[in-house]
Amino acid sequence: TLSKLCGILGKMWTFRDAADPRAQACAEAEKTIIEAIIPDGNALRFNIYLSGIHEKLADIALASKDYDTAVKELKKALDYAIEMEKAQTSGKQYYACLILDHYDYDYSDSRQWGSYAKDLLERLSENIKYNPIRERKDFKALYD
């Protein structure tokens, strides 16, 4: 299934150092696969995968001191986390894309999982790796 494939790719980039080019290759591959299968953006629970991917891409940009890209990727990560929360509160939903159009996802059991956006913002505020961008206006805007 798509979840298992994303999980495998996710493990490949999650446990690699941000400076490792294989981390970026795996994250980009997972993102490309999700976007190819779900081109309409109705990602439902795959929003959390996309949030994690963009968080990793931000880490990769930080490692190369590309702070503009890092903040842009963190904004995307936060946007996907917020979309995941919106999907969770809506109950049962259906994918609209051709490949997954016969699948649905029932969020009724996942409503107690918490706030993905809040968790992401906590990680950003607690982790020292974000110190180089912490004082930027665009980084601070993530908390607005």
Task: Give the residues covered by each predicted segment.
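Alpha-helical protein-protein interaction modules
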Residues: 1-136, 140-144
